[in-house]
Amino acid sequence: MQNTYTFEQFQKLNEVLSMAKECLKDFDNQNNFESRCQLRRTVGSLIEDLNLRNSSPHKRRIYYNWDILNEYSCKKQDVLFVIEALTGIKKDLFATFYDKIFISHSEKDYAIAKELISLLHGIGIKKPVNGLDGQIFCSSYDGYLIPLRENNTEYIKAQLDSTDNVLSLILYSKNYMNSAACLNEAGAIWIKDISFYPIILPDFSFEEIKGFLNPNITGFKINDKYKLNEFKDNLIKYFNLQELNYNIWEQDRDTFISRLNNINVANL
């Protein structure tokens, strides 16, 4: 069935999820009655806006959790159930909209990942600012790193299993295929059924893709300017970004490709 939901509705669902998380944080505070009332009203408004009363299979999922969200007797577990239900609905109904990008790459391909991150920011993907997370996370670039003392694989799994819709960009290369850590990341993407783009680095080919993930999903060579145009257009739709001035985009794209050509992949 064609997706008839809007990015504005996606944002509203995110706001309700944020409200539920805030309600959860201060749940032990006896004065949080008003936050529970507000959460119940807002969830009710969301149900009407998304027409979930007549939407199956989402109907049972939301109604079970909606019915137990009573502001007088609501327990912490009840709010957790609501968060779980809304997250499931978000991933089902808004599968073509995304909150974040995960770049899965070999640390030996760091220089290429760095250039890609710069290109993504030029397209409009948000940077980390003023202590707030941006829309990109990966394992080897300052500002986007996994926190110190965190287990990389477990942290990535937790991010992929969060309430966020995550789009994974997999930078396939010989380095990637020879890295146990990278294959663990690919396994996490497969287990969580996360949407992904196969991006083929200059030293690699489509025929060499193997492992957990579907090799038939359409990807592109990272230095293919026409495929980069299509990639940019898709990101604008996925993240509801403003259209770019085409001349500026062409300059950014061509600069990106030129910088890639100056990176000696074999010696990374």
PLM features: what roles do these ranges have?
Residues 2-35, 64-88, 92-95, 114, ...:
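C-terminal interaction surface of TIR/SEFIR-family domains
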Residues 40, 174-191:
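Conserved TIR/SEFIR loop-to-helix hotspot centered on a Trp-containing motif
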Residues 109, 113-117, 182:
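Short, highly selective alpha-helical patches that border small-molecule cofactor pockets
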Residues 121-159, 174-179:
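Conserved BB-loop
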Residues 125-129, 187-198, 202:
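Arginine/glycine-rich "motif VI" loop of SF2 helicases in the C-terminal RecA-like domain
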Residues 142, 174-175, 196, 200-207:
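Short beta-alpha junction loops
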Residues 145-147, 178-181, 205-212:
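Switch/connector loops and helix/strand junctions flanking conserved nucleotide-binding motifs
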Residues 167-170:
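Inter-motif core of Ras-like GTPase G domains
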